[in-house]
């Protein structure tokens, strides 16, 4: 269902300032599994858009606002329902992911998470850093937001 969207993400090359986690087909598939689960299990959607993937969360999992630690330790059905299908080569804890999903633990409705720029912006040559996306990167990100909504 999300194949075309995932393929568009995969088309974007990494650079000295941006890492594309969706070049890894396993990470791209994890995003697809997450989106399909949300679509299948909810009938109304709220899209919550963050800034960009962090190096310890979405850069590794492919799922916005989500770290491997969140996936492994959450009792939310979204994760208990999919975690055995996901590829996690590294388990990291990420502060924002922990705060967001802990808050949602007792909520009946979950948002669909996305980022204004879906790739990991980092300092030059340092993929273990986070930086805010540039205006041009946010403009680029609008394309992917529109594709996701379609």
Label each PLM-derived region with a short phrase.
Residues 1-150:
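A polyanion-binding, active-site-adjacent surface
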